[in-house]
Amino acid sequence: MKIIILLGFLGATLSAPLIPQRLMSASNSNELLLNLNNGQLLPLRLQGPLNSWIPPFSGVLQQQQQAQIPGLAQFSLSALDQFAGLFPNQIPFPGQASFAQGAQAGQVDPSQAQTPPQTQPGPNHVMPYVFSFKMPQEQGQMFEYYPVYVLLPWEQPQQTVPRSPPQTRQQQYEEQIPFYDQFGYIPQLAEPAIPGGQQQLAFDPQLGTAPEIAVMSTGEEIPYLQKEVINFRRDSAGVLMPSTSPKPSTTNVFTSAIDRTITAKFPEEKAKTDGLREP
């Protein structure tokens, strides 16, 4: 058992390189490269333009030498620490302007990148979708905002309601009285008066009622006359039929078709047959 443990330690010591070597991949792509130098783990190194955005490990005193890439701004470690506390949409990217400042497109200088952009609230200022809960400037001031869909009383559009012409007490009383028919409740509304001295004739084909003609003079007012209901339909029939049609009689339908001479012979023949049957 001890031999196996010793062989394990020996293999672990032989596998660790004594000379710092740079591990390269076969495809030479943008992969993480690890260096071992006297048992100390150096910060990660990335081959590509994202080399400046990788923060170093904590506790490392040695700074990694980075190659200067033309066209990209190099940021210091203090600038990266300041960017970590900003909003996601307020981090300035190299080659384009910050979203919060709204400036024209251009490259960001290292001196400007070290100071975080300060936004001042204005009328057209758009709040970011991620915001902190503690705002030192506006912590003591709490405002109540109305939703967008709420309209104030003085902003609501005024709706004009058409007013009906004034009616007399007699007409209002007649409109409230219901009219009961065999079909159920049918409200009767008063017909509007036509200026000119005569009222409009209204014939209801469903009810079969014809109102009276109310003649009104221009100088005096005649109260509205109650309708006189004239029934043009039969109570037993479901179809409207005029009352002037002759009523069919069903009393002599069967008597006229039977011959009375035949009916008189039946009792005589019956009496003869009864007499023959008797012994």
UniProtKB/Swiss-Prot annotation:
Protein name, as recorded: Odontogenic ameloblast-associated protein
Residue stretches of biased makeup (Low complexity): 100-123
Glycosylation positions in this chain: T115, T119, T168, T244, T250, T251, T255, T273
Region (Disordered), start-end ranges: 100-125
Signal peptide coordinates: 1-15
Keywords: Biomineralization, Cytoplasm, Glycoprotein, Nucleus, Secreted, Signal
Subunit field text: Interacts (via C-terminus) with ARHGEF5.
Species of origin: Macaca mulatta (Rhesus macaque)
Domain of life assignment: Eukaryota
Task performed by this protein: Tooth-associated epithelia protein that probably plays a role in odontogenesis, the complex process that results in the initiation and generation of the tooth. May be incorporated in the enamel matrix at the end of mineralization process. Involved in the induction of RHOA activity via interaction with ARHGEF and expression of downstream factors such as ROCK. Plays a role in attachment of the junctional epithelium to the tooth surface.
Gene Ontology biological process terms, A to Z: biomineral tissue development; inflammatory response; odontogenesis of dentin-containing tooth; positive regulation of epithelial cell proliferation involved in wound healing; positive regulation of gene expression; regulation of actin cytoskeleton organization
Gene label: ODAM
Cellular compartment(s): Secreted; Cytoplasm; Nucleus
Family: Belongs to the ODAM family.
